[in-house]
């Protein structure tokens, strides 16, 4: 799939929003990518995940397990795992810390791919990497539907994205939209 084909899916799903947004990272932005608008359409989710799976297969081979952070990474991890024919699990927050629950495990020595819907600063992905590594897993790659950093985030492993785009963001104290008096909204999964 080309970047234009991926972008068409996001446009058709009305997932590209304009306004003033407070991101999970705490930064502010004039654009927001609401992947849930894409993920509500199983054919789009399957198509994008198969694309990510093909990139992963070519780039790092077949992992033992795919793992994504709740909330946004669950469907992506599941569909990528399905396309690769491997287990798919997810982490969730417990008392503010990312953890494996529901008897999910990463076995020592397993090769892991971390999947996410959107990467901005990479904070949630790094937490999942830490969980997988602490369990004895070897993280081979990260994959996301959208890389908002346009390739600027470094996880220390190959990073594959279906769509890479540069989206401006600022610390709240430097946000021009705040200075204009425009209220910021928090559209993401962590409010």
From Swiss-Prot:
Domain of life: Bacteria
EC number: 2.4.2.10
Stored InterPro entries: OPRT (IPR023031), Orotate_PRibTrfase_bac (IPR006273), PRibTrfase_dom (IPR000836), PRTase-like (IPR029057)
GO process annotations (BP): 'de novo' UMP biosynthetic process; pyrimidine nucleobase biosynthetic process
Pathway listed: Pyrimidine metabolism; UMP biosynthesis via de novo pathway; UMP from orotate: step 1/2
Residues given in the record as orotate binding sites: 120, 148
GO molecular function: magnesium ion binding; orotate phosphoribosyltransferase activity
Cofactor needs: Mg(2+)
Signal peptide: none
Reaction catalysis annotation: orotidine 5'-phosphate + diphosphate = orotate + 5-phospho-alpha-D-ribose 1-diphosphate
Binding site for 5-phospho-alpha-D-ribose 1-diphosphate: 116-124
SUPFAM superfamilies xref list: PRTase-like (SSF53271)
Keyword line: Glycosyltransferase, Magnesium, Pyrimidine biosynthesis, Transferase
Known role: Catalyzes the transfer of a ribosyl phosphate group from 5-phosphoribose 1-diphosphate to orotate, leading to the formation of orotidine monophosphate (OMP).
HAMAP family in alphabetical order: PyrE
Subunit structure and binding partners: Homodimer.
Family: Belongs to the purine/pyrimidine phosphoribosyltransferase family. PyrE subfamily.
NCBIfam families: pyrE_Therm
Official protein name in the record: Orotate phosphoribosyltransferase
Lineage per the UniProt record: Bacteria, Bacillati, Bacillota, Clostridia, Eubacteriales
């Amino acid at each position: 799939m080309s970047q234009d084909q991926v972008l068409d899916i996001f446009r058709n799903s009305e997932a590209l929003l304009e306004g003033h947004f407070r991101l999970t990272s705490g930064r502010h932005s004039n654009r927001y990518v609401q992947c849930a608008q894409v993920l509500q359409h199983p054919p789009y989710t399957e198509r994008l995940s198969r694309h990510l799976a093909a990139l992963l297969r070519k780039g790092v081979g077949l992992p033992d397990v795919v793992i994504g952070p709740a909330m946004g990474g669950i469907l992506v991890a599941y569909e990528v795992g399905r396309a690769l024919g491997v287990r798919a699990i997810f982490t969730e927050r417990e008392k503010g810390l990312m953890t494996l629950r529901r008897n999910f495990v990463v076995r020592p020595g397993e090769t892991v791919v971390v999947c996410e819907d959107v990467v901005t600063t990479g904070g949630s992905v790094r937490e999942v990497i830490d969980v997988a590594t602490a369990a004895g897993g070897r993280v081979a790659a990260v994959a996301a539907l959208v890389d908002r950093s346009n390739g600027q985030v470094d996880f220390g492993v190959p990073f594959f994205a279906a769509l890479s785009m540069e989206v401006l963001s600022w610390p709240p104290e430097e946000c021009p939209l705040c200075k204009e008096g425009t209220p910021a909204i928090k559209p993401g999964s962590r409010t």
